[in-house]
């Protein structure tokens, strides 16, 4: 049997985050894509806020504010900046 790769979370954007994506240029989208790949592979990687399950992940001039679901199968992205 072949070795299965780890399950990755599905990324879903709130409307506000989707609008922010539409305003980004190609370089910003490329940086954001790398950050989202990291979050999808490990939804718990971001720093948890003091107020619940909201997490923030920052890397390479990218900031993503998101909420991972309890089972880690879905990541709800609320805010992005690059």
Sequence positions of predicted segments:
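Enriched for short, Lys/Arg-rich terminal
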Residues: 1-11, 19-34, 38, 58-82
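Major-groove DNA-recognition helix of helix-turn-helix-type DNA-binding domains
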Residues: 42-45
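Short, hydrophobic/aromatic-rich segments at coil-to-beta transitions
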Residues: 49-56
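PIN/NYN-family metal-dependent endoribonuclease catalytic core
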Residues: 14
């Amino acid at each position: 049997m072949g070795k299965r790769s780890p399950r990755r979370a599905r990324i879903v954007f709130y409307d506000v985050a989707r609008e922010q994506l539409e305003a980004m240029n190609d370089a910003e989208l490329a940086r954001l894509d790398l950050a989202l790949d990291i979050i999808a592979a490990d939804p718990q990687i971001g720093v948890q806020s003091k107020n619940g399950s909201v997490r923030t992940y920052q890397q390479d001039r990218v900031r993503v504010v998101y909420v991972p679901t309890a089972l880690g199968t879905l990541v709800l992205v609320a805010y992005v900046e690059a």
